[in-house]
Protein backbone atom coordinates (compact mmCIF):
# COMPACT_ATOMS: atom_id res chain seq x y z
CA UNK A 1 0.00 0.00 0.00
CA UNK A 2 1.51 3.35 -1.00
CA UNK A 3 2.19 6.11 1.50
CA UNK A 4 -0.16 9.11 1.33
CA UNK A 5 0.81 11.96 -0.96
CA UNK A 6 3.41 14.03 0.86
CA UNK A 7 4.14 11.16 3.26
CA UNK A 8 1.48 11.83 5.93
CA UNK A 9 -2.28 11.27 5.83
CA UNK A 10 -3.63 14.65 6.93
CA UNK A 11 -6.67 13.37 8.85
CA UNK A 12 -7.73 16.63 10.51
CA UNK A 13 -10.75 15.01 12.16
CA UNK A 14 -8.46 12.70 14.12
CA UNK A 15 -5.87 15.42 14.70
CA UNK A 16 -8.37 17.88 16.20
CA UNK A 17 -10.62 15.42 18.02
CA UNK A 18 -9.48 16.46 21.51
CA UNK A 19 -10.37 20.12 20.93
CA UNK A 20 -13.63 19.51 19.08
CA UNK A 21 -15.82 20.88 21.89
CA UNK A 22 -13.68 23.99 22.18
CA UNK A 23 -13.88 24.59 18.43
CA UNK A 24 -17.62 23.94 18.45
CA UNK A 25 -18.15 26.57 21.14
CA UNK A 26 -16.07 29.06 19.21
CA UNK A 27 -17.99 28.40 15.98
CA UNK A 28 -21.30 28.98 17.75
CA UNK A 29 -20.22 32.19 19.48
CA UNK A 30 -21.89 35.41 18.38
CA UNK A 31 -18.70 37.35 17.63
CA UNK A 32 -17.07 35.02 15.07
CA UNK A 33 -17.29 35.63 11.34
CA UNK A 34 -19.41 32.95 9.62
CA UNK A 35 -19.33 31.63 6.04
CA UNK A 36 -21.92 29.21 4.67
CA UNK A 37 -20.15 26.72 2.43
CA UNK A 38 -21.30 26.25 -1.17
CA UNK A 39 -21.95 22.73 -2.54
CA UNK A 40 -18.50 22.64 -4.17
CA UNK A 41 -16.80 23.96 -1.03
CA UNK A 42 -18.55 21.29 1.05
CA UNK A 43 -17.08 18.59 -1.17
CA UNK A 44 -13.63 20.18 -1.03
CA UNK A 45 -13.60 20.67 2.72
CA UNK A 46 -14.69 17.09 3.37
CA UNK A 47 -11.68 15.79 1.44
CA UNK A 48 -9.35 18.25 3.17
CA UNK A 49 -10.61 17.24 6.61
CA UNK A 50 -10.58 13.48 6.00
CA UNK A 51 -7.16 13.43 4.33
CA UNK A 52 -8.32 12.69 0.80
CA UNK A 53 -6.57 15.87 -0.34
CA UNK A 54 -3.34 15.19 1.58
CA UNK A 55 -0.99 17.02 1.92
CA UNK A 56 -3.44 19.96 2.06
CA UNK A 57 -4.52 21.13 5.51
CA UNK A 58 -6.57 24.11 4.36
CA UNK A 59 -7.60 26.20 1.39
CA UNK A 60 -4.74 27.42 -0.80
CA UNK A 61 -3.07 30.72 0.01
CA UNK A 62 -2.00 32.97 -2.84
CA UNK A 63 1.53 31.55 -3.17
CA UNK A 64 0.28 27.97 -3.35
CA UNK A 65 -2.59 28.94 -5.65
CA UNK A 66 -0.32 30.74 -8.12
CA UNK A 67 2.14 27.86 -8.13
CA UNK A 68 -0.59 25.27 -8.73
CA UNK A 69 -2.13 27.28 -11.56
CA UNK A 70 1.14 27.90 -13.41
CA UNK A 71 3.27 24.87 -12.48
CA UNK A 72 0.89 22.17 -11.16
CA UNK A 73 2.78 22.22 -7.86
CA UNK A 74 2.37 23.66 -4.40
CA UNK A 75 4.84 26.37 -3.42
CA UNK A 76 7.05 23.74 -1.72
CA UNK A 77 7.30 21.78 -4.99
CA UNK A 78 4.82 19.02 -4.16
CA UNK A 79 2.86 17.83 -7.20
CA UNK A 80 -0.72 19.19 -7.08
CA UNK A 81 -2.70 20.03 -10.20
CA UNK A 82 -6.07 21.54 -9.17
CA UNK A 83 -6.46 24.78 -7.15
CA UNK A 84 -8.54 24.12 -4.02
CA UNK A 85 -9.82 27.54 -3.02
CA UNK A 86 -12.42 29.12 -0.76
CA UNK A 87 -14.12 31.66 -3.01
CA UNK A 88 -16.16 34.47 -1.42
CA UNK A 89 -17.86 37.65 -2.59
CA UNK A 90 -16.34 41.12 -2.23
CA UNK A 91 -18.59 42.15 0.67
CA UNK A 92 -17.44 39.18 2.73
CA UNK A 93 -13.81 39.59 1.69
CA UNK A 94 -13.82 43.17 2.96
CA UNK A 95 -14.59 41.91 6.48
CA UNK A 96 -11.49 39.70 6.61
CA UNK A 97 -8.01 40.48 7.86
CA UNK A 98 -4.98 38.20 8.32
CA UNK A 99 -5.40 35.84 11.29
CA UNK A 100 -9.19 36.33 11.26
CA UNK A 101 -10.95 33.14 12.31
CA UNK A 102 -13.97 32.14 10.25
CA UNK A 103 -16.54 29.52 11.21
CA UNK A 104 -17.48 27.44 8.17
CA UNK A 105 -21.01 26.05 8.17
CA UNK A 106 -23.08 23.57 6.19
CA UNK A 107 -26.63 24.73 5.35
CA UNK A 108 -26.28 27.65 7.80
CA UNK A 109 -26.76 25.17 10.65
CA UNK A 110 -23.97 22.60 10.94
CA UNK A 111 -20.50 23.85 12.01
CA UNK A 112 -17.84 22.04 9.99
CA UNK A 113 -14.51 23.74 10.70
CA UNK A 114 -12.75 26.96 11.65
CA UNK A 115 -10.44 28.64 9.16
CA UNK A 116 -7.53 30.77 10.33
CA UNK A 117 -6.95 33.25 7.51
CA UNK A 118 -3.49 33.62 5.98
CA UNK A 119 -4.47 35.90 3.13
CA UNK A 120 -7.33 37.19 1.00
CA UNK A 121 -6.57 37.71 -2.68
CA UNK A 122 -8.26 38.45 -5.97
CA UNK A 123 -7.22 35.80 -8.49
CA UNK A 124 -6.65 36.36 -12.17
CA UNK A 125 -9.48 34.14 -13.32
CA UNK A 126 -8.49 34.50 -16.97
CA UNK A 127 -5.11 32.92 -16.25
CA UNK A 128 -6.73 30.22 -14.10
CA UNK A 129 -9.18 29.42 -16.90
CA UNK A 130 -6.41 29.21 -19.49
CA UNK A 131 -3.83 27.28 -17.46
CA UNK A 132 -6.08 24.87 -15.57
CA UNK A 133 -8.98 24.39 -18.01
CA UNK A 134 -7.42 25.41 -21.37
CA UNK A 135 -9.51 28.54 -21.80
CA UNK A 136 -12.58 27.44 -23.76
CA UNK A 137 -15.43 29.57 -22.33
CA UNK A 138 -17.85 26.67 -22.88
CA UNK A 139 -15.92 24.47 -20.44
CA UNK A 140 -18.26 23.86 -17.46
CA UNK A 141 -15.54 24.71 -14.94
CA UNK A 142 -14.80 28.00 -16.69
CA UNK A 143 -18.49 28.82 -16.71
CA UNK A 144 -18.55 28.10 -12.97
CA UNK A 145 -15.40 30.16 -12.42
CA UNK A 146 -16.81 33.31 -14.01
CA UNK A 147 -20.54 32.96 -13.33
CA UNK A 148 -20.77 31.25 -9.94
CA UNK A 149 -17.52 31.47 -7.98
CA UNK A 150 -16.80 34.52 -5.82
CA UNK A 151 -14.26 37.09 -6.97
CA UNK A 152 -11.98 36.71 -3.94
CA UNK A 153 -10.19 33.67 -2.52
CA UNK A 154 -9.44 33.14 1.17
CA UNK A 155 -6.35 31.10 2.01
CA UNK A 156 -5.73 29.56 5.39
CA UNK A 157 -5.46 26.51 7.61
CA UNK A 158 -8.39 24.48 8.91
CA UNK A 159 -9.27 23.05 12.30
CA UNK A 160 -11.86 20.30 12.08
CA UNK A 161 -15.12 20.09 13.99
CA UNK A 162 -16.87 17.41 11.95
CA UNK A 163 -17.28 16.12 8.42
CA UNK A 164 -20.21 17.44 6.38
CA UNK A 165 -23.44 15.64 7.21
CA UNK A 166 -24.75 13.02 4.78
CA UNK A 167 -28.00 11.16 5.31
CA UNK A 168 -27.51 8.59 2.55
CA UNK A 169 -25.28 5.52 2.35
CA UNK A 170 -23.34 6.03 5.61
CA UNK A 171 -21.82 2.57 5.38
CA UNK A 172 -20.38 3.27 1.94
CA UNK A 173 -18.71 6.60 2.71
CA UNK A 174 -15.29 5.41 3.85
CA UNK A 175 -12.64 7.98 4.72
CA UNK A 176 -9.04 7.36 3.60
CA UNK A 177 -8.12 6.11 7.08
CA UNK A 178 -11.13 3.78 7.17
CA UNK A 179 -10.50 2.44 3.69
CA UNK A 180 -6.83 1.83 4.43
CA UNK A 181 -7.84 -0.13 7.54
CA UNK A 182 -10.36 -2.08 5.45
CA UNK A 183 -7.65 -3.05 2.98
CA UNK A 184 -5.29 -4.02 5.79
CA UNK A 185 -7.91 -6.20 7.47
CA UNK A 186 -8.53 -7.96 4.15
CA UNK A 187 -4.77 -8.17 3.51
CA UNK A 188 -5.19 -6.30 0.24
CA UNK A 189 -1.84 -4.66 -0.49
CA UNK A 190 -2.49 -4.25 -4.22
CA UNK A 191 -5.72 -2.46 -5.16
CA UNK A 192 -6.84 -1.12 -8.55
CA UNK A 193 -9.10 1.92 -8.16
CA UNK A 194 -11.80 2.59 -10.74
CA UNK A 195 -13.15 6.13 -11.09
CA UNK A 196 -16.63 6.63 -12.51
CA UNK A 197 -19.45 9.18 -12.60
CA UNK A 198 -21.73 6.98 -14.71
CA UNK A 199 -23.71 3.77 -14.19
CA UNK A 200 -21.68 0.60 -14.70
CA UNK A 201 -22.53 -2.14 -17.17
CA UNK A 202 -21.06 -5.49 -18.17
CA UNK A 203 -18.19 -3.92 -20.10
CA UNK A 204 -17.08 -1.98 -17.01
CA UNK A 205 -17.19 -5.11 -14.91
CA UNK A 206 -15.14 -6.93 -17.55
CA UNK A 207 -12.45 -4.26 -17.88
CA UNK A 208 -12.00 -3.85 -14.11
CA UNK A 209 -11.73 -7.60 -13.55
CA UNK A 210 -9.17 -7.83 -16.36
CA UNK A 211 -7.19 -4.92 -14.91
CA UNK A 212 -7.16 -6.55 -11.48
CA UNK A 213 -6.00 -9.89 -12.85
CA UNK A 214 -3.24 -8.31 -14.92
CA UNK A 215 -2.03 -6.35 -11.87
CA UNK A 216 -2.54 -9.28 -9.48
CA UNK A 217 -4.70 -6.94 -7.42
CA UNK A 218 -8.18 -6.38 -6.03
CA UNK A 219 -10.72 -3.80 -7.27
CA UNK A 220 -11.92 -0.62 -5.57
CA UNK A 221 -15.06 0.74 -7.21
CA UNK A 222 -14.71 4.40 -6.20
CA UNK A 223 -17.49 6.43 -7.86
CA UNK A 224 -17.87 10.19 -7.46
CA UNK A 225 -21.01 11.19 -5.55
CA UNK A 226 -20.22 14.87 -5.10
CA UNK A 227 -20.54 17.25 -8.05
CA UNK A 228 -20.10 15.82 -11.54
CA UNK A 229 -20.91 17.01 -15.05
CA UNK A 230 -24.24 18.81 -15.45
CA UNK A 231 -26.78 16.37 -16.86
CA UNK A 232 -25.20 13.26 -15.34
CA UNK A 233 -27.45 10.58 -13.86
CA UNK A 234 -28.13 11.31 -10.18
CA UNK A 235 -25.92 9.57 -7.65
CA UNK A 236 -28.79 7.73 -5.94
CA UNK A 237 -29.58 5.85 -9.14
CA UNK A 238 -25.90 5.18 -9.75
CA UNK A 239 -25.24 3.90 -6.24
CA UNK A 240 -28.12 1.43 -6.53
CA UNK A 241 -26.52 0.24 -9.77
CA UNK A 242 -23.09 -0.12 -8.14
CA UNK A 243 -24.59 -2.08 -5.26
CA UNK A 244 -26.07 -4.56 -7.71
CA UNK A 245 -23.17 -4.86 -10.11
CA UNK A 246 -20.62 -5.51 -7.38
CA UNK A 247 -22.51 -8.74 -6.67
CA UNK A 248 -21.48 -9.86 -10.17
CA UNK A 249 -17.76 -9.77 -9.35
CA UNK A 250 -15.90 -12.90 -8.28
CA UNK A 251 -16.28 -13.34 -4.53
CA UNK A 252 -13.77 -11.34 -2.50
CA UNK A 253 -12.28 -9.37 -5.38
CA UNK A 254 -14.11 -6.03 -5.25
CA UNK A 255 -15.09 -3.34 -2.73
CA UNK A 256 -17.41 -0.35 -3.14
CA UNK A 257 -16.79 3.02 -1.50
CA UNK A 258 -18.17 6.46 -2.41
CA UNK A 259 -16.03 9.54 -3.05
CA UNK A 260 -17.52 12.98 -2.14
CA UNK A 261 -15.54 14.80 -4.82
CA UNK A 262 -16.53 17.93 -6.72
CA UNK A 263 -15.20 17.18 -10.19
CA UNK A 264 -13.90 20.03 -12.33
CA UNK A 265 -13.93 18.00 -15.57
CA UNK A 266 -10.41 19.26 -16.21
CA UNK A 267 -9.15 16.32 -18.24
CA UNK A 268 -5.44 15.60 -17.93
CA UNK A 269 -4.87 17.75 -14.83
CA UNK A 270 -7.85 16.16 -13.16
CA UNK A 271 -6.56 12.66 -13.94
CA UNK A 272 -3.37 13.41 -11.99
CA UNK A 273 -5.50 14.80 -9.15
CA UNK A 274 -7.66 11.67 -9.17
CA UNK A 275 -4.56 9.49 -8.96
CA UNK A 276 -3.28 11.46 -5.94
CA UNK A 277 -6.65 11.11 -4.21
CA UNK A 278 -6.78 7.35 -4.83
CA UNK A 279 -3.25 6.98 -3.49
CA UNK A 280 -4.39 8.75 -0.32
CA UNK A 281 -7.25 6.26 -0.07
CA UNK A 282 -4.78 3.37 -0.23
CA UNK A 283 -4.97 2.24 -3.86
CA UNK A 284 -1.77 1.01 -5.50
CA UNK A 285 -3.10 1.17 -9.07
CA UNK A 286 -5.45 3.56 -10.86
CA UNK A 287 -7.35 3.09 -14.11
CA UNK A 288 -7.06 6.17 -16.30
CA UNK A 289 -9.70 6.23 -18.98
CA UNK A 290 -9.82 7.51 -22.51
CA UNK A 291 -10.65 11.25 -22.29
CA UNK A 292 -10.54 10.82 -18.51
CA UNK A 293 -12.57 13.49 -16.68
CA UNK A 294 -13.19 15.39 -19.90
CA UNK A 295 -16.50 17.18 -20.45
CA UNK A 296 -16.80 15.93 -24.04
CA UNK A 297 -17.20 18.41 -26.89
CA UNK A 298 -18.07 22.08 -27.12
CA UNK A 299 -20.95 23.45 -29.21
CA UNK A 300 -18.77 23.31 -32.34
CA UNK A 301 -18.13 19.60 -31.87
CA UNK A 302 -14.52 20.12 -30.78
CA UNK A 303 -13.17 17.98 -27.93
CA UNK A 304 -12.05 19.93 -24.88
CA UNK A 305 -9.21 17.41 -24.43
CA UNK A 306 -7.45 14.86 -26.59
CA UNK A 307 -8.43 11.21 -26.03
CA UNK A 308 -5.07 10.26 -24.51
CA UNK A 309 -3.99 13.54 -22.89
CA UNK A 310 -4.89 12.26 -19.43
CA UNK A 311 -3.02 8.98 -19.75
CA UNK A 312 0.07 10.75 -21.08
CA UNK A 313 0.17 13.39 -18.33
CA UNK A 314 -0.34 10.87 -15.52
CA UNK A 315 2.34 8.66 -17.02
CA UNK A 316 4.77 11.60 -17.11
CA UNK A 317 4.40 12.00 -13.32
CA UNK A 318 4.38 8.30 -12.43
CA UNK A 319 7.60 8.42 -10.38
CA UNK A 320 6.25 11.23 -8.19
CA UNK A 321 2.77 9.78 -7.92
CA UNK A 322 3.92 6.41 -6.55
CA UNK A 323 0.80 4.76 -7.97
CA UNK A 324 0.71 2.47 -10.99
CA UNK A 325 -1.28 3.78 -13.94
CA UNK A 326 -3.52 1.24 -15.66
CA UNK A 327 -4.58 2.55 -19.09
CA UNK A 328 -8.26 2.03 -19.81
CA UNK A 329 -8.61 -0.73 -22.41
CA UNK A 330 -11.97 -0.52 -24.11
CA UNK A 331 -13.70 -3.89 -24.35
CA UNK A 332 -16.35 -4.87 -26.86
CA UNK A 333 -18.87 -7.68 -27.09
CA UNK A 334 -18.31 -10.56 -29.53
CA UNK A 335 -21.80 -11.94 -30.22
CA UNK A 336 -20.59 -15.02 -32.08
CA UNK A 337 -18.50 -16.03 -29.07
CA UNK A 338 -20.72 -14.57 -26.32
CA UNK A 339 -17.83 -12.84 -24.58
CA UNK A 340 -16.10 -9.50 -24.13
CA UNK A 341 -12.58 -8.82 -25.39
CA UNK A 342 -10.27 -5.80 -25.57
CA UNK A 343 -11.03 -4.03 -28.83
CA UNK A 344 -7.32 -3.57 -29.57
CA UNK A 345 -6.99 -7.37 -29.75
CA UNK A 346 -9.81 -7.80 -32.27
CA UNK A 347 -9.67 -7.59 -36.05
CA UNK A 348 -13.00 -5.87 -36.58
CA UNK A 349 -12.85 -6.59 -40.32
CA UNK A 350 -13.13 -10.30 -39.56
CA UNK A 351 -14.91 -10.41 -36.20
CA UNK A 352 -18.41 -9.13 -35.53
CA UNK A 353 -18.70 -6.79 -32.54
CA UNK A 354 -21.57 -5.07 -30.75
CA UNK A 355 -21.72 -2.00 -28.57
CA UNK A 356 -24.33 0.47 -27.32
CA UNK A 357 -23.22 4.07 -26.88
CA UNK A 358 -24.31 6.24 -23.98
CA UNK A 359 -26.47 8.28 -26.35
CA UNK A 360 -28.18 5.17 -27.68
CA UNK A 361 -28.71 3.84 -24.15
CA UNK A 362 -30.43 7.07 -23.13
CA UNK A 363 -32.61 6.89 -26.25
CA UNK A 364 -33.68 3.33 -25.45
CA UNK A 365 -34.49 4.29 -21.89
CA UNK A 366 -36.50 7.26 -23.12
CA UNK A 367 -38.63 5.25 -25.54
CA UNK A 368 -38.74 2.02 -23.54
CA UNK A 369 -36.55 0.21 -26.09
CA UNK A 370 -34.84 -3.11 -25.49
CA UNK A 371 -31.55 -3.13 -23.58
CA UNK A 372 -29.99 -6.54 -24.25
CA UNK A 373 -28.56 -8.67 -21.48
CA UNK A 374 -25.18 -8.85 -23.19
CA UNK A 375 -24.87 -5.10 -22.59
CA UNK A 376 -26.13 -4.80 -19.01
CA UNK A 377 -27.47 -6.99 -16.25
CA UNK A 378 -31.27 -7.17 -15.83
CA UNK A 379 -31.13 -5.81 -12.29
CA UNK A 380 -29.13 -2.79 -13.51
CA UNK A 381 -31.56 -2.13 -16.35
CA UNK A 382 -34.47 -2.35 -13.90
CA UNK A 383 -32.93 0.39 -11.73
CA UNK A 384 -32.25 2.62 -14.73
CA UNK A 385 -35.80 2.18 -16.01
CA UNK A 386 -37.23 3.08 -12.61
CA UNK A 387 -35.27 6.34 -12.61
CA UNK A 388 -35.71 6.97 -16.35
CA UNK A 389 -39.22 5.80 -17.24
CA UNK A 390 -40.26 5.86 -20.91
CA UNK A 391 -42.21 8.87 -22.12
CA UNK A 392 -45.70 7.31 -21.73
CA UNK A 393 -44.95 7.06 -17.99
CA UNK A 394 -43.36 10.49 -17.63
CA UNK A 395 -45.10 13.63 -16.48
CA UNK A 396 -45.30 16.88 -18.39
CA UNK A 397 -46.44 20.46 -17.96
CA UNK A 398 -48.17 22.79 -20.42
CA UNK A 399 -47.65 26.50 -19.66
CA UNK A 400 -50.13 28.87 -21.29
CA UNK A 401 -48.23 31.81 -22.78
CA UNK A 402 -48.92 35.45 -22.01
CA UNK A 403 -50.16 36.31 -25.51
CA UNK A 404 -53.23 34.04 -25.50
CA UNK A 405 -56.53 35.87 -25.77
CA UNK A 406 -58.84 32.87 -25.39
CA UNK A 407 -60.30 32.11 -21.98
CA UNK A 408 -57.51 30.54 -19.95
CA UNK A 409 -60.04 28.91 -17.67
CA UNK A 410 -61.93 27.31 -20.55
CA UNK A 411 -58.74 26.24 -22.36
CA UNK A 412 -57.43 24.67 -19.13
CA UNK A 413 -60.71 22.81 -18.63
CA UNK A 414 -60.72 21.69 -22.27
CA UNK A 415 -57.18 20.34 -22.04
CA UNK A 416 -57.90 18.58 -18.75
CA UNK A 417 -61.09 16.98 -20.09
CA UNK A 418 -59.30 15.83 -23.24
CA UNK A 419 -56.37 14.32 -21.34
CA UNK A 420 -58.66 12.47 -18.93
CA UNK A 421 -60.41 10.63 -21.73
CA UNK A 422 -57.10 8.99 -22.68
CA UNK A 423 -57.10 6.78 -19.59
CA UNK A 424 -56.34 6.80 -15.89
CA UNK A 425 -52.63 6.04 -15.94
CA UNK A 426 -51.55 9.63 -15.31
CA UNK A 427 -52.66 12.21 -12.74
CA UNK A 428 -53.64 15.63 -14.14
CA UNK A 429 -54.08 18.98 -12.45
CA UNK A 430 -54.69 22.61 -13.35
CA UNK A 431 -52.07 24.53 -11.42
CA UNK A 432 -52.63 28.18 -10.48
CA UNK A 433 -49.38 29.30 -8.88
CA UNK A 434 -49.73 32.99 -7.90
CA UNK A 435 -46.11 33.91 -8.62
CA UNK A 436 -44.77 31.71 -5.79
CA UNK A 437 -41.23 30.77 -6.79
CA UNK A 438 -41.04 28.15 -4.06
CA UNK A 439 -43.64 26.15 -5.98
CA UNK A 440 -41.10 25.39 -8.72
CA UNK A 441 -39.95 22.32 -6.83
CA UNK A 442 -43.54 21.19 -6.35
CA UNK A 443 -44.11 21.41 -10.09
CA UNK A 444 -41.05 19.26 -10.72
CA UNK A 445 -42.32 16.76 -8.13
CA UNK A 446 -45.61 16.44 -10.01
CA UNK A 447 -43.79 15.96 -13.30
CA UNK A 448 -41.36 13.49 -11.74
CA UNK A 449 -44.23 11.36 -10.49
CA UNK A 450 -45.61 11.02 -14.01
CA UNK A 451 -48.40 13.59 -13.67
CA UNK A 452 -49.65 16.10 -16.20
CA UNK A 453 -49.85 19.77 -15.21
CA UNK A 454 -51.56 22.69 -16.90
CA UNK A 455 -50.25 26.10 -15.79
CA UNK A 456 -52.53 28.94 -16.92
CA UNK A 457 -50.10 31.76 -16.06
CA UNK A 458 -46.33 32.20 -16.30
CA UNK A 459 -44.31 33.85 -13.57
CA UNK A 460 -43.85 37.50 -14.33
CA UNK A 461 -40.14 37.35 -13.51
CA UNK A 462 -38.39 35.31 -16.23
CA UNK A 463 -35.72 33.99 -13.88
CA UNK A 464 -38.38 32.19 -11.90
CA UNK A 465 -40.18 30.75 -14.92
CA UNK A 466 -40.71 27.02 -15.17
CA UNK A 467 -40.33 27.23 -18.94
CA UNK A 468 -37.15 25.50 -20.04
CA UNK A 469 -37.19 22.94 -17.24
CA UNK A 470 -37.30 19.26 -18.21
CA UNK A 471 -40.65 18.18 -19.67
CA UNK A 472 -42.10 21.70 -19.35
CA UNK A 473 -43.45 23.05 -22.63
CA UNK A 474 -44.61 26.55 -23.52
CA UNK A 475 -47.82 26.94 -25.49
CA UNK A 476 -47.77 30.39 -27.09
CA UNK A 477 -47.57 32.41 -30.30
CA UNK A 478 -43.90 33.31 -29.79
CA UNK A 479 -41.23 31.76 -32.00
CA UNK A 480 -39.57 30.25 -28.93
CA UNK A 481 -42.69 28.36 -27.88
CA UNK A 482 -42.55 24.58 -27.81
CA UNK A 483 -46.13 24.39 -29.08
CA UNK A 484 -46.47 27.35 -31.41
CA UNK A 485 -49.85 28.85 -32.26
CA UNK A 486 -50.52 30.77 -35.46
CA UNK A 487 -52.53 33.42 -33.63
CA UNK A 488 -53.44 34.34 -30.08
CA UNK A 489 -57.12 33.74 -30.67
CA UNK A 490 -57.08 30.29 -32.26
CA UNK A 491 -60.16 28.28 -31.31
CA UNK A 492 -59.74 26.22 -28.18
CA UNK A 493 -60.52 23.01 -30.07
CA UNK A 494 -57.63 23.72 -32.47
CA UNK A 495 -55.27 24.46 -29.59
CA UNK A 496 -56.22 21.25 -27.78
CA UNK A 497 -55.57 19.24 -30.93
CA UNK A 498 -52.13 20.81 -31.36
CA UNK A 499 -51.23 20.04 -27.74
CA UNK A 500 -52.36 16.42 -28.01
CA UNK A 501 -50.45 15.88 -31.25
CA UNK A 502 -47.33 17.48 -29.75
CA UNK A 503 -47.50 15.22 -26.70
CA UNK A 504 -48.05 12.18 -28.91
CA UNK A 505 -45.08 13.10 -31.11
CA UNK A 506 -42.92 13.39 -27.99
CA UNK A 507 -44.00 10.02 -26.64
CA UNK A 508 -46.24 11.04 -23.73
CA UNK A 509 -49.32 9.49 -25.29
CA UNK A 510 -49.39 6.21 -27.19
CA UNK A 511 -52.63 5.70 -29.11
UniProtKB/Swiss-Prot annotation:
GO biological process: hydrogen sulfide biosynthetic process; sulfate assimilation, phosphoadenylyl sulfate reduction by phosphoadenylyl-sulfate reductase (thioredoxin); sulfur amino acid metabolic process
Site residues, Transition state stabilizer: 201, 204
Annotated keywords: ATP-binding, Cytoplasm, Nucleotide-binding, Nucleotidyltransferase, Transferase
Active-site residue numbers: 196-198
Induction: Expression depends on the formation of the MET4-MET28-MET31 and MET4-MET28-MET32 complexes on its 5' upstream region.
Site for Induces change in substrate recognition on ATP binding, residues: 328
Pfam families, sorted: ATP-sulfurylase, PUA_2
Region (Required for oligomerization): 394-511
Additional remark text: Present with 1510 molecules/cell in log phase SD medium.
UniProt comment concerning the protein's domains: The oligomerization domain is distantly related to APS kinases, but it is not functional and does not bind APS. It is required for oligomerization of the enzyme, although the oligomerization state has no effect on the catalytic activity of the enzyme.
Gene3D superfamilies recorded: HUPs (3.40.50.620), P-loop containing nucleotide triphosphate hydrolases (3.40.50.300), Sulfate adenylyltransferase (3.10.400.10)
Gene Ontology molecular-function annotations: ATP binding; sulfate adenylyltransferase (ATP) activity
Assigned protein family: Belongs to the sulfate adenylyltransferase family.
Region (Catalytic): 168-393
GO annotation, cellular component aspect: cytoplasm; mitochondrion
Pathway: Sulfur metabolism; hydrogen sulfide biosynthesis; sulfite from sulfate: step 1/3
Catalytic activity as recorded in UniProt: sulfate + ATP + H(+) = adenosine 5'-phosphosulfate + diphosphate
NCBIfam families for this protein: sopT
CDD domains per record: ATPS (cd00517)
Function: Catalyzes the first intracellular reaction of sulfate assimilation, forming adenosine-5'-phosphosulfate (APS) from inorganic sulfate and ATP. Plays an important role in sulfate activation as a component of the biosynthesis pathway of sulfur-containing amino acids.
Protein name (record): Sulfate adenylyltransferase
Stretches of the chain forming a coiled coil according to its record: none
Location of this chain's protein in the cell: Cytoplasm
Amino acid sequence: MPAPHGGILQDLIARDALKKNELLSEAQSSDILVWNLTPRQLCDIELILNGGFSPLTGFLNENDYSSVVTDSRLADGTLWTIPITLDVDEAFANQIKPDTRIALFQDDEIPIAILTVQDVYKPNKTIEAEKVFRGDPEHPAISYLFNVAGDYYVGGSLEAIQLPQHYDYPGLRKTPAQLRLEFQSRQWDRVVAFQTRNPMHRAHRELTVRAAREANAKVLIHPVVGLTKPGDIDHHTRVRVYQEIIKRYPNGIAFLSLLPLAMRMSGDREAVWHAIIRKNYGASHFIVGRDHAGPGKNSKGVDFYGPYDAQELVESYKHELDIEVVPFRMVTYLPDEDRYAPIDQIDTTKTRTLNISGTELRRRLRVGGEIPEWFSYPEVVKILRESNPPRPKQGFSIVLGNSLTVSREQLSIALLSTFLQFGGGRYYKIFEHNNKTELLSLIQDFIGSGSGLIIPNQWEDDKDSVVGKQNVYLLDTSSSADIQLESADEPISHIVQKVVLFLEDNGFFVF
